[in-house]
């Protein structure tokens, strides 16, 4: 019923879905560790500030390291205002509250999120965005599952100064933009997307005016940059 701040006095264990209602701001301060039970989610309808620092990052991990004991996802659904995630390490996530919609460890549906200095590893699908907007910078993503590391469908996207470590799995792109207008993909490093039909950057579904500049792409099995389905880009 009121805005809440969580500090790093001790680890917090999330045993079930954590809902942030539309009239609430939850702030998680530097150094906090969240240990997530199997299948539990952070569901944001209001606003979330995850405020790690370089010296004291925030860790969001599975409660148990037992194989396949994965937690859900951080899900933004029609969130009231822009949320921010900075200097945070995310691991052990799967899919969100509605797996048919919340595909990513960070899933944003018709919401606005700003992400910086985030490390995502050992997840099923790093980031999925549908409408709204995403700005992500200075972040590192890796994954061993078939997915697109950042998949944006509709809305606005700024992806810059990020590093993507690929794998040998098939049908996996580092960045996939669909029906995005005025997106920017800039100064990223993309390594070793070696599975069949895998691209570094894939622009499709009538995306328009996408700026792609100063990206380094090493060893993409299919295409470094793929543009199709009536899309337009500036490279």
Question: Each predicted region: which residue ranges?
Answer:
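Beta-strand/loop edge motif enriched in small/polar residues
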Residues: 1-235
């Amino acid at each position: 019923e009121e805005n809440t701040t969580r500090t790093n006095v001790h680890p917090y264990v999330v045993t079930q879905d954590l809902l942030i209602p539309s009239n609430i701001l939850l702030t998680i301060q530097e150094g906090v560790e969240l240990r997530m039970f199997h299948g539990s989610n952070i569901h944001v309808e209001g606003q979330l500030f995850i405020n790690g620092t370089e010296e004291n990052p925030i860790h969001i991990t599975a409660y148990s390291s037992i194989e396949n004991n994965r937690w859900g996802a951080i899900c933004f659904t029609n969130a009231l205002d822009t949320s921010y995630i900075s200097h945070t390490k995310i691991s052990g996530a799967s899919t969100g509250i509605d797996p048919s919609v919340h595909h990513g460890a960070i899933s944003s549906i018709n919401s606005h999120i700003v992400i910086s200095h985030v490390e995502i590893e050992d997840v099923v699908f790093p980031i999925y965005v549908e409408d709204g907007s995403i700005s992500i910078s200075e972040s590192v993503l890796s994954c061993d599952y078939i997915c697109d590391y950042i998949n944006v469908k509709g809305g606005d996207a700024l992806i810059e100064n990020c590093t993507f470590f690929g794998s040998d799995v098939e049908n996996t792109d580092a960045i996939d933009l669909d029906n995005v207008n005025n997106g920017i993909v800039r100064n990223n490093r993309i390594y070793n997307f070696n599975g069949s039909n895998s691209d570094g950057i894939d622009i499709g579904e009538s995306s328009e005016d996408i700026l792609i500049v100063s990206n380094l792409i090493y060893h993409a099995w299919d295409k470094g940059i793929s543009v199709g389905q009536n899309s337009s880009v500036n490279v």
